[in-house]
């Protein structure tokens, strides 16, 4: 077994006494833990100390704890620290310090997980690449990603998210990337932050962690580009703007939107790189442009990265296309269930509008964390929904406003929550339908997706 962390490294990083063994990996979930890994008992919604005994029984080499949990013997292999989240952070910083990989950090109001996955996919064609799992982008997800960085990684891609002001900067400093990417500044988390200007300021904090002499990949077409570029230059970073405008360093051109694909040309450093993605939507092409620019900034061949993206598959819940069997044939499910904002919903509706279908159905849950602007933003998007869909189903108190703003012939059912729609929708589908499911994470729209997969027969 190859050790990711030796006993001595664990002790040096955390300041704890050396444990009796090293670890082949790092886990915070006893359900998915692999034998030989370090289990970190985080205090979250459920206290991880209650699962230490289970983790050790499943083969954990060590458990990081802040006390000896009940039911765990004094001789158990424990790494005792004052605070397990701080201990995980110490491992993350130590992993970053020892790694020789090229690090890229990605944030943004929309598209960050997709860009992260595009970078994972494209850079893997060049060399060993490590990246954040799922959307592990918060105060425990970032240090966990860093602590898991393989010793032989050539590239590492770290996603950084936020819910409140002041969360990005410390995670960016911990990551210390050579390349920092901001995908977009949009009305997401508008409630907690209060304005687009505050959102831009918070997203720009990723630049505070970037290493001097590094590169900032920024959305050229955003009205906040000049402000972000000035911050980057003040940090000693080179600026690469991506977008469709003539001033973009990485410029997306000749976009051809298909029902199931998008193709384009990416102009970068005098080269004209052909791009073809097996995922539709202009927003996907822009995400790919950001990923190609970031990979190039890390020293990867952008042509090879662009070519590799021809085999990219969208992340579950973020644009994945799933054929589902229905009476008389097949329908197409567009799974956008993971999260939602006005700009992301409009992009998804544009994909639905282009889908080859006899009937286009949009299933929309509330867009949360929009603050006082929330009601008006839901009403505004009703026009896009009416133009893109033949029938619109909604759930949640905010989408009731969207529902009421629709032309009567476009109104499907409105429900209080996604559980009701999950029971209602499957019997209504017909062969040839295309169904888009999208809503904020808190609306649990994945229940609708699962119901359509399981019961639409």
Task: Name every feature range the model reports, one short phrase each.
Residues 1-90, 94, 354-357, 384-387, ...:
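N-terminal leader/targeting and accessory segments in enzymes
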Residues 10, 37, 55, 91, ...:
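Residue-level signal for inorganic ion chemistry
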Residues 43-46, 315-317, 337-414, 440, ...:
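Active-site beta-alpha connecting loops in nucleotide-dependent enzymes
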Residues 69-74, 179-332, 357-358, 383-386, ...:
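Acidic, Mg2+-coordinating active-site environments of NTP-dependent enzymes
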Residues 79-83, 412-421:
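Short acidic-hydrophobic, aromatic-tinged amphipathic segments that line or gate anion-handling sites
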Residues 87-220, 226-235, 427, 450-457:
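Phosphate-binding loop of NTP-binding sites
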Residues 101-107, 130, 181-187, 219, ...:
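Short beta-strands and strand-loop turn motifs
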Residues 107, 425-453:
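A glycine-rich beta-strand to alpha-helix segment
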């Amino acid at each position: 077994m190859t050790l990711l962390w030796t006993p001595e490294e664990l002790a040096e990083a955390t300041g704890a006494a050396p444990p009796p063994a090293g670890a082949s990996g790092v886990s915070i979930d006893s359900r998915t833990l692999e034998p030989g890994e370090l289990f970190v008992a985080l205090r979250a919604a459920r206290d991880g100390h209650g699962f230490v005994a289970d983790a050790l029984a499943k083969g954990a080499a060590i458990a990081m704890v802040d006390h000896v949990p009940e039911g765990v013997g004094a001789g158990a292999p424990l790494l005792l620290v004052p605070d397990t989240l701080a201990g995980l952070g110490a491992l993350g910083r130590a992993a970053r310090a020892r790694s020789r990989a090229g690090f890229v950090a990605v944030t943004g109001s929309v598209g960050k997980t997709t860009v992260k996955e595009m970078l994972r996919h494209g850079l893997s064609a060049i060399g060993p690449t490590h990246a954040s799992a799922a959307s592990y982008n918060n105060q425990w997800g970032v240090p966990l990603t860093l602590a898991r960085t393989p010793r032989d990684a050539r590239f590492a891609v770290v996603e950084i998210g936020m819910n409140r002001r002041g969360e990005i900067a410390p995670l960016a400093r911990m990551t210390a990337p050579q390349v920092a990417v901001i995908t977009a500044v949009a009305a997401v988390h508008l409630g907690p932050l209060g304005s687009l200007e505050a959102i831009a300021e918070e997203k720009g904090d990723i630049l505070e962690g970037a290493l001097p002499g590094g590169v900032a990949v920024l959305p050229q077409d955003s009205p906040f580009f000049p402000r972000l570029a000035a911050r980057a230059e003040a940090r000693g970073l080179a600026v690469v703007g991506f977008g469709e405008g003539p001033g973009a360093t990485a410029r997306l051109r000749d976009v051809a939107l298909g029902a199931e694909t998008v193709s384009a040309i990416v102009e970068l450093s005098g080269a004209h790189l052909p791009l073809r993605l097996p995922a539709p939507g202009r927003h996907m092409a822009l995400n790919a442009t950001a990923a190609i620019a970031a990979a190039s900034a890390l020293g990867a061949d952008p042509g090879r990265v662009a070519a590799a993206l021809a085999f990219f598959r969208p992340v579950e819940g973020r644009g994945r296309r799933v054929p589902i069997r229905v009476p008389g044939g097949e329908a197409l499910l567009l799974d956008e269930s993971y999260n939602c904002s006005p700009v992301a919903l409009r992009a998804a509706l544009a994909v639905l509008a282009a889908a080859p279908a006899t009937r286009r159905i949009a299933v929309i849950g509330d867009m949360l964390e929009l603050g006082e602007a929330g009601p008006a933003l839901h009403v505004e998007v009703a026009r896009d929904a009416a133009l893109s869909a033949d029938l619109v189903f909604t759930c949640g108190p905010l989408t009731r406003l969207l529902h009421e703003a629709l032309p009567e012939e476009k109104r499907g059912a409105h429900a209080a929550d996604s559980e009701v729609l999950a029971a209602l929708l499957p019997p209504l589908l017909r062969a040839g339908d295309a169904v888009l499911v999208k809503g904020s994470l808190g609306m649990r729209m994945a229940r609708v997706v699962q119901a359509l997969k399981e019961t639409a027969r």
